[in-house]
């Protein structure tokens, strides 16, 4: 049992608006007319496409393979035919399109052959690879690959935390999932504990979800495993932030640049645990998720939706009211505006929120900062947002980093309380984007400079090698010339030596003459003309031999 709960700094308590969508059970959304499946479903990398236009696929068939350690596979959410592979709008603040597979369902929803995965009989690394190939990522919004988070870390995992806080207003998909599928969530947690080697499991749920807490505690009793505890945590936004929930449950503060694994703690969304259970126990890759449709809706609720479903085809399920003028993907605190209703549902989509001038009135004009310090009081990362605002606005990014810009979790608490209605988080996102872009440019410039320096070094080395070869050749010529001069400088031979040399030369000449002696040709059978021709040839040979004889120097 946990002896006590801890508090995190800051935070706010906005109106929750949970009851609007939490009352009804999860409903299954019908098959859409088409699916748009972005090839980048994890937060870090894009998968490699495996299909071609015109190809038929089954539900759960891999259509894009993971490449790199931070990538996960992508699968067909239903059976059908690949229409095209083309850039399509995706839920991102930039609004830029991304490569996607467009799939036309055949209406049969035929699965691939599914087999349970025996995770207990294989090494943990093999199970992590299996989860990567099943496309399992964090379903709380960040989309970080689950197989990476299940790694052993530097010190091993002591405590596994399931995040069921769901602290942002309006969103209730995790609440309904815990009420209806608690057994699957805890079965997934048990699988994760086996993979990571964790000793205990803590399930953190905000105390404004009593039915979810009761359902999860009953599931713990049915599972019958030791060291699993469901903990009700105080309702305060952003208690569902990973570092904040770790702080509340364990008292551990995770500094910037460090992960929970550095302290023996790892945190997973309850939806991720359920996805791992479906992948391992049923052989089902992640092709659907539960999301909330709420806000300015006539029939808000939670729906199980295929990944890739266009938002436009989901909205009739909840019947937006006539005065709806905009939509958010995510909650009102951290969500991003949808620039197109053709944007598809991705694995990290937890809510579609409809807005209206009455429900979400447009913000008043931005006023100058009065340095009241309210933003610093509510910042859960204990930053000074007003200072970060000045540096970000003035593009003094170095100072912004000195003031721990990247510790900001973009929860929106500072913007929520700002009396000047300054969109502080927008400034911080802008500054982070500029810094990342500059670092990327600097990295590219460093690579180019390194290549240039290597080329200069290679050219200098080749130049030195050529100079060394030329010097060696010059030295060899000099030595040869010196040897010739030394030979020419030797004194003349004596008469006795000359006579001896003459005798040797004469002996050599006799030996050569004997060797070259040509035996008379057999000319008895030749005609007189032929014999005369042979004789002429022999005469010429004799003349040549006589001319080739060396002239011996005679002594005086």
Give the location of each predicted region.
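N-terminal, Lys/Arg-enriched amphipathic/low-complexity engagement segments
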Residues: 1-50, 102
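Short, well-structured beta-strand-loop connectors
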Residues: 52-65, 84
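Ferredoxin-type iron-sulfur electron-transfer modules in oxidoreductases and energy-metabolism complexes
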Residues: 349-366, 376, 380-490
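Acidic low-complexity segments
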Residues: 84, 89-139, 144, 210
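Conserved hydrophobic positions within beta-strands
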Residues: 80-82
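Gly-rich Lys/Arg/Thr-decorated short loops/hinges at beta-loop-alpha junctions or inter-strand turns
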Residues: 109-111, 138, 160-174, 297
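Charge-dense, low-complexity intrinsically disordered regions
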Residues: 489-556
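Hydrophobic alpha-helical positions that pack around
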Residues: 165, 199-311, 317-322
